[in-house]
């Protein structure tokens, strides 16, 4: 990597006059020296570098380090460090590529190699009260990459703090970066600056509870995550007398917090205060820098957290009653401030759910929902519980599931004229399912319609558009089918559908049965990657002559291709390219005509990150293969709503086949039906003994499927 290293002369001019010439000269070679092992990180010592405002300040500071070292016999008459990196990200030459003297050469050897003989030394120009700037960290990362790949004497993979096997506080707050795999390691992903208070929390919780039964050590990285908050949870359990500790904030932990009847401002157990402060730091709220104290900084952040959750901190009774809920949420990765991509109107819905149904009604099964503006699985479950309450389901029976009791309640009270809170919840469900689509493009639900009791024209218009797009009866009313479509991706699973798919061969007799039961199109698999005799073999592939048998029964069919679509490892560009070619060959073998859409399956709950890293590249491979073979066939995608939306947008899928019956998938929560949906798989059932069938809504004007075949 090309980097700029400022030579000694840039700072040598600031050395005392009698030493300026020596300070500015190139470094003198020293022996023994190889530098092949790695790097040590250093800092300037105690205090603050708040005086390093300009680059001239930094050059003077480097000259000051030189002056300290040149007067000491310990450093062999020169500045000790090979390179120095300032807060502005500028890199300065010290000993450069020659042997340095800053790594505590008399300390124990590492793998038989002396610390000054085998390691470069890099000084980050911070002191004990400072944290490294992003510019400094990026430059250290780039410098290490340069030393590994471009330096005259290339170094190895090791990254260590000066304190490794040596009694020193150095490198101060750079400790959390001074190892392999951190953000300064060019072989690891860039993560940006870590949080020193999260790091100190991680160090403290590990040191304090490592001997507690069941305790799991959390990585000391300075970045929060599930590992950290679960270790904090175990620390909490230990302080509350729960043993062995477990990585779960369950009913036992909740009740132990509740029975303590104390909020942080009145807590006298310093370890509990350390846990609470650490949890605030991990959640991104400022807290006491002394973990064992609870001052105004911590209390102010807690007040803000209550407000962010939609709770009333000023109400002493509610503050105490909600504390177990608040602490449980603190010790999770839920966010309560608007995150990038979050919607403030969704956040208002989330806060209202917390205020009314957790703090107000006190639904026993309901936890605080995140308030980040993202409609997630937990928020969907909270909304479902609120609807269950407002439709008359007993508190003890509320569970957040779209089961028979909920369905019956929605067919009754839910389908009557709505007022008050139930009307609000219905309209909130409309908003989180927005946009829907019309012939003119996207139709967004108006935020102003969420909280009004008026039956506005904009509300009715959107609702009718949603029903029409979802292929429901267009009533403009809160009927059961509409409720179901708003709440779960499968919608009303009892509704009629003209599409289906299966792994079973469609014989002439089976084709006639499908036709007689109202089906007009069936999805069938082009191939199977397992051979007969394999324990996982399903026999799902189209059989010779089967396409014509389907057509002779008065049906159409649509081709599906899926090899190991349930595993992330299947989704790479190369596998997509290979499977695209196989799908083309199989479709042509069966005489399927040009222009047909082949659906490639993503049959698991792929996260947004996995869609970006694996699924989209896979479909780009499919696209390249089909194009290389003349673009005889187009490609579609089978998967959750989010998978279908992303693959259609980022890879160009023609049609979407939505796995709507997987209503628990995160990719089916908070995402609308894709604009290009053609099939919505809503129900799986046994059509006949041994013949399982998926019940699919086939969209009017969608993919026409295959209506004729030629010779293969």
Regions found by a protein language model. Give the residues of each.
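N-terminal catalytic cores of peptidoglycan-degrading enzymes
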Residues: 1-115, 169-170, 482-565, 654-665
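Active-site cleft segment of glycoside hydrolase catalytic domains centered on the general acid/base Glu
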Residues: 173-178, 605-629
């Amino acid at each position: 990597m090309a980097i700029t290293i400022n030579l000694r002369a840039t700072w040598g001019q600031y050395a005392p006059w009698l030493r300026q010439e020596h300070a500015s000269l190139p470094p003198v070679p020293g022996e023994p020296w190889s530098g092949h092992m790695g790097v040590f990180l250093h800092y300037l010592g105690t205090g603050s570098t708040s005086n390093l405002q300009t680059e001239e300040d930094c050059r003077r500071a480097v000259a000051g380090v030189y002056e300290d070292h040149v007067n000491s016999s310990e450093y062999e008459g020169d500045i000790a460090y090979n390179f120095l990196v300032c807060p502005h990200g500028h890199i300065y030459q010290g000993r450069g590529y020659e042997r340095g003297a800053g790594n505590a050469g008399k300390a124990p050897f590492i793998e038989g190699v002396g610390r000054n003989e085998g390691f470069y030394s890099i000084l980050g120009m911070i002191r004990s009260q400072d944290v490294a700037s992003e510019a400094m960290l990026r430059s250290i990362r780039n410098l290490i990459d340069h030393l590994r790949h471009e330096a005259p004497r290339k170094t190895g993979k090791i990254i260590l703090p000066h304190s490794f096997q040596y009694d020193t506080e150095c490198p101060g707050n750079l400790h959390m970066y001074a190892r392999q795999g951190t953000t300064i390691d060019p072989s690891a992903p860039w993560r940006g600056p870590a949080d020193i208070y999260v790091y100190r929390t991680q160090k403290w919780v590990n040191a304090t509870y490592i001997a507690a039964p069941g305790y799991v050590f959390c990585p000391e990285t300075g970045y929060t995550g599930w590992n950290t908050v679960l270790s904090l949870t175990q620390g909490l359990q230990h302080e509350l007398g729960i043993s062995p500790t477990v990585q779960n904030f369950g009913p036992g932990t909740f009740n132990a917090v509740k029975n303590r009847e104390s909020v942080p401002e009145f807590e006298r157990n310093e370890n509990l205060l350390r846990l609470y402060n650490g949890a605030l730091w991990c959640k991104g709220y400022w807290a006491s820098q002394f973990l064992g104290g609870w001052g105004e900084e911590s209390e102010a952040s807690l007040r803000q957290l209550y407000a962010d959750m939609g709770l009333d901190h000023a109400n002493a009774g509610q503050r105490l009653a909600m504390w177990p809920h608040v602490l449980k949420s603190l010790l999770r990765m839920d966010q309560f401030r608007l995150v990038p991509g979050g919607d403030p109107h969704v956040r208002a819905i989330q806060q209202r759910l917390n205020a009314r149904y957790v703090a107000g009604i006190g639904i026993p099964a309901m936890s605080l929902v995140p308030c980040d503006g993202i409609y997630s699985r937990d928020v969907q479950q909270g909304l479902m519980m609120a609807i269950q309450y407002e439709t008359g389901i007993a508190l003890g029976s509320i569970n957040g599931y779209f089961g028979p009791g909920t369905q019956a309640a929605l067919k009754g009270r839910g389908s009557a004229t709505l007022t008050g809170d139930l009307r609000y919840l219905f309209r909130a469900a409309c908003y989180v399912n927005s946009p829907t689509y019309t012939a003119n493009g996207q139709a967004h639900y108006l935020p102003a319609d969420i909280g009004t009791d008026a039956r506005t024209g904009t509300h009715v218009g959107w609702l009718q558009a949603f029903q029409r797009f979802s292929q429901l009866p267009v009533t403009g009313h809160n009927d059961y089918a509409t409720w179901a479509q708003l709440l779960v991706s499968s919608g009303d699973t009892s509704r009629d559908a003209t599409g289906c798919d299966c792994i079973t061969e469609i014989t002439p007799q089976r084709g006639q049965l499908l036709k007689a039961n109202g089906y007009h199109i069936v999805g069938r698999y082009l191939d199977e990657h397992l051979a007969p005799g394999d324990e996982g073999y399903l026999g799902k592939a189209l059989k010779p002559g089967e396409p014509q048998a389907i057509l002779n029964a008065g049906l159409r069919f649509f081709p599906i291709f899926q090899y190991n679509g349930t595993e992330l490892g299947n989704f790479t560009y190369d596998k997509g390219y290979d499977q695209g070619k196989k799908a083309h060959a199989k479709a042509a073998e069966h005489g399927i005509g040009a222009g047909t859409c082949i659906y490639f399956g993503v049959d698991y709950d792929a996260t947004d990150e996995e869609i970006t890293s694996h699924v989209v590249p896979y479909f780009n491979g499919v696209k390249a293969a089909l194009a290389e073979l003349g673009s005889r066939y187009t490609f579609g995608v089978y998967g959750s709503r989010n998978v279908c939306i992303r693959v259609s947008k980022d890879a160009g899928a023609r049609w979407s086949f939505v796995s709507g019956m997987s209503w628990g998938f995160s990719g089916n929560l908070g995402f609308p039906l894709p604009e290009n949906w053609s099939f919505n798989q809503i129900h799986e059932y046994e059509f006949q003994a041994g013949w399982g069938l998926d019940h699919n809504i086939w969209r009017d004007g969608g993919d026409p499927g295959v209506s004729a075949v030629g010779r293969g």
